[in-house]
């Protein structure tokens, strides 16, 4: 909010819980209604700040709103940073089926700021590591080697954002791992 105020940008925002159980078409409809209520224009980019579920449902809402409204994704979790956030696949669950509704609508920009990782529960850090292991096993064994080199320090330091100095070994390994995982995803 401070950034937008400093740059005299009119900011309207909504807060949504975005757990896996919330990844439903009704949440997409809610977001669509809010965009209409706020008077968001078709070509006015929407800023989405959140994790993987929000990337999926808010990205899908952007795809539907006036047929492909642009959006910027600011990723706050590891999974959204390396998978859901930059992905052109947007979706929601419906009628008891996972990812029943969807559209291809990539963000115009996807940003991952590791400083958000310090707010994550260790379970969410491990979830991100599991996603990276999957990528490494399928495509790039260097990811597995980097994960082994970092060891439990990845969880303890939330990918180099807690109790560590910039430029430290874990800071460097964290950046390498995230960069290589994102590269692996994009390729």
Enumerate the language-model features and the residues they cover.
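Loop/helix-junction capping segments adjacent to catalytic residues or to phosphate/diphosphate-binding pockets
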Residues: 21-25, 55-56, 119
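Active-site and donor-binding regions of nucleotide-sugar-utilizing enzymes
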Residues: 40-72
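A glycine/threonine-rich phosphate-anchoring loop and its flanking beta-alpha core
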Residues: 59-156
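Active-site segments that bind and position negatively charged phosphate/pyrophosphate groups
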Residues: 156-187
């Amino acid at each position: 909010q401070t950034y937008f105020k400093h740059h005299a940008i009119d900011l309207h925002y909504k807060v949504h819980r975005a757990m896996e159980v919330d990844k439903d078409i009704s949440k997409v409809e809610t977001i669509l209604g809010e965009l209409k209520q706020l008077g968001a224009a078709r070509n006015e980019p929407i800023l989405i700040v959140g994790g993987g579920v929000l990337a999926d449902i808010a990205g899908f809402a952007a795809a539907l709103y006036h047929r492909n409204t642009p959006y910027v994704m600011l990723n706050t979790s590891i999974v959204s940073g390396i998978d859901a956030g930059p992905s052109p696949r947007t979706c929601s669950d419906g009628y008891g089926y996972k990812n029943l509704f969807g559209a291809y609508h990539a963000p115009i920009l996807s940003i991952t700021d590791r400083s958000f990782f310090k707010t994550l529960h260790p379970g969410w850090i491990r979830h991100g590591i599991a996603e990276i292991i999957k990528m490494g096993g399928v495509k790039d064994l260097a990811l597995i080697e980097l994960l082994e080199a970092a060891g439990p320090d990845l969880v303890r330091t939330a990918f180099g954002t807690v109790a560590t100095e910039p430029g430290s070994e874990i800071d460097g390994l964290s950046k390498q791992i995230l960069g290589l995982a994102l590269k692996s995803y994009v390729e």
